Amino acid sequence: KAEEEVEKNKEEAEEEAEKKIAE
């Protein structure tokens, strides 16, 4: 489903943002 892809992308984007903030 495309919706599942969107959810996955959102979660990955949040993780990347957290990593950048942690640095």
From Swiss-Prot:
Positions of disulphide bridges: none
Location of the region described as Disordered in the Swiss-Prot/TrEMBL record: 1-23
Source domain of life: Viruses
Biased composition (Basic and acidic residues): 7-23
Biological role: Gp22 functions in head assembly.
Protein name: Major prohead-scaffolding core protein Gp22
